[in-house]
């Protein structure tokens, strides 16, 4: 076979491989939506687009690109929103901006007055569902008026309010174990108005705790809204 023929074949092979695409965080993939096979689509009212300021470079390794559409995720039939209006506590007793009640008030808009800001370093918020429940999804909006990625995002579920026993970790993108809860295998992601859906995997617990450790724009921690979906116990 001539050298030119070999080069043509190599070029075709590379072209076909690139057509396979990659995970752009757009919700769903070649294998279909995530979540429970045979389940029903999880739906929530999405906030309008609002981009302010100049984003800073995001240098997080293995970063998932910003999605171009709402995520596709399936949950068991009968799954309900469990977190609306529920009590939220935090490792930061006095948030810099906003009130912890904003996390479960149902409003996902960006901008001043819609988010709570916690101090720097590793911090957590915790939602009390009121009873031990089967959790199938945790939908998170940290801050979406600027493209950024939050560091050391860990999501845990437990019946223990102190999170010392019976803890199930359903998401962890702390790749270097900064938070001292084990190295996570999940990838950091870019914040958008579509939020981030974490698979609850049917974990049971009354409390849902979310950690973060600053972001690519500044050292603070933010939450606009967190929605916990599942079946009450």
Language model features with spans:
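Trp- and acidic/polar-enriched beta-sheet ligand-binding modules for extracellular glycan
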Residues: 32-53, 117-123, 145-233
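C-terminal motif of bacterial Sec signal peptides marking the signal peptidase cleavage site
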Residues: 17-18
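Sec-dependent signal peptide recognition
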Residues: 2-9
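N-terminal pre-domain segments of enzymes
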Residues: 30-79
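A short beta-strand element within beta-rich, extracytoplasmic domains
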Residues: 88, 134-145, 210
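Ser/Thr/Gly/Pro-rich low-complexity, disordered linker/stalk segments of secreted
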Residues: 21-31
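A short glycine/threonine-centered beta-strand motif
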Residues: 129-131, 158
């Amino acid at each position: 076979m001539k050298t030119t023929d070999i080069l043509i074949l190599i070029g075709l092979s590379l072209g076909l491989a690139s057509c396979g695409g990659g995970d752009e965080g757009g919700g769903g993939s070649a294998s279909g939506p995530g979540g429970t096979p045979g389940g029903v689509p999880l739906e929530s009212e999405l906030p309008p687009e609002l981009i302010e300021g100049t984003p800073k470079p995001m240098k997080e390794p293995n970063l998932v690109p910003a999605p171009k559409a709402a995520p596709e995720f399936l949950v068991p039939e009968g799954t309900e929103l469990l977190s609306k209006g529920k009590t939220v506590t935090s490792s930061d007793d006095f948030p810099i901006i906003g009130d912890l009640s904003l996390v479960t008030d149902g409003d996902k808009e960006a901008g001043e007055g819609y988010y709570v800001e916690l101090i720097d370093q590793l911090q957590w918020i915790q939602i009390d569902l009121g009873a031990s429940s089967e959790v199938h999804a945790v939908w998170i909006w940290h801050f979406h008026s600027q493209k950024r990625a939050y560091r050391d995002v860990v999501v845990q579920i437990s019946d223990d309010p102190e999170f010392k026993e019976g803890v199930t970790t359903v998401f962890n993108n702390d790749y270097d174990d900064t938070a001292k809860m084990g190295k996570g295998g999940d990838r950091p992601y870019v914040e958008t108005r579509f939020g981030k859906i974490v698979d609850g995997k049917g974990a049971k617990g009354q409390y849902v705790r979310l950690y973060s450790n600053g972001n690519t724009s500044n050292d603070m921690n933010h939450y606009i809204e967190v929605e916990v979906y599942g079946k009450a116990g």
